[in-house]
Amino acid sequence: MSANTPFMTAEALLQHWQGHRRLTRRVIDAFPDDQLFSFSIGGMRTFGALALEILAMTVPTVRGVVSDEWIPLLDHTQRPKHELLAQWDASTADLDRLWPQIPSQRFAETVTAFGQYTNVVYKLIAYAIDNEIHHRGQGYVYLRALGIEPPPFHIRA
């Protein structure tokens, strides 16, 4: 590999992210319906609220990268688990549809997301992925506290 050869392609980054999203979906699905938006520990947010935050970041961020229109997803209303999973699946399809529209040079450009977060595009995307991983970890703790074995973290298929 030469110094000018990227170690990861945009497609590889998308597949990495989608692997995390598949795992997070399994964590959402592991929650009992009545605990998704009610169970928390130590005053922290419920996993349902965290999942809605992940949804609010994922597609709006990528859509903003593509179009430079930064429209936040503001609906944080509690919903039944089956509706949350349907929204998750729709956002996965949106991500797959939008991602190829990002020109390769765009990843190195500096943008201001949502009128307040100025950073390089690949760092904004990395933050969205990191935020999902962080919140999923909280979901793992909640599931264990509920006596439920969470999905194996290393299986992302």
Residue ranges and their predicted role:
Residues M1-E11:
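Basic/polar N-terminal segments that are highly enriched at the extreme N-terminus
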Residues S2, L14-D29, D33-H76, A113-A157:
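Short, contiguous alpha-helical
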Residues T9, H16-H20, Q87-A90:
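Soluble or luminal CAZymes and related metallo-dependent hydrolases
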Residues R63-I102:
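Helix-adjacent hinge/juxtasegments
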Residues P100-G115:
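Acidic catalytic patch
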